[in-house]
Amino acid sequence: MTSTTTDNATTVATIYRAFGAGDVDTLMGLIAQDVRWESDWEDNFAQRAGGPAFYRPLHGRDQLGTFFEAMGANTFHQLEVRDVIADGDRAVARVALEYTMPSGGRYRDEQLHLWTFDGDGKVIAIRHFLDTAKLLAATRGEDTTAGPS
């Protein structure tokens, strides 16, 4: 493992700690000005089907306020980083989440978050891999936590 790979894994861990603490300044300091957020999907149906605002494509750090505002409207019950695996300019985090949405819907899932870094170690892209059917159901007000996850 190279020092860059180790640094990228550490950066991802720092991002989740800052997110959990509501430390937006630390988060923004780790993200490149021209970041691409959920924007590299060729055809993401959940984005077209009325998914929540935090799951829409964003371009540039100045648009991330939309993401943090939308995520901040949820009531979090769990945010657990289970693993971070890094290689070269990418890192993948396996994250367990559970939260209640403003619609009253409850969402629980285990996701993969793919982070891409520039040569300076700043995040230039993130893409979330998740159960989009659950996300859309919770957005409509359904409880997706019933039964095994």
Each language-model region and where it sits:
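Short N-terminal micro-motifs specific to bacterial/archaeal maturation
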Residues: S3, A18, F54-Y55, I126
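Short, low-complexity N-terminal intrinsically disordered segments enriched in polar/charged residues
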Residues: M1-Q33, D143-S149
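Short glycine-rich loop/turn motifs that provide flexible caps or phosphate-binding loops at active sites
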Residues: A21, H59, S103
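A beta-strand edge to alpha-helix "cap/lid" segment located at domain peripheries
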Residues: T2-D7, E69-S149
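Hydrophobic pocket/interface hotspot
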Residues: V12-I15, L27, V35, G60, ...
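A solvent-exposed, acidic/Ser-Thr-rich amphipathic alpha-helical stretch
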Residues: Q33-G88
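Short, mixed-charge, low-aromatic patches
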Residues: A18-M28, G50-A53, F68-G72, R94
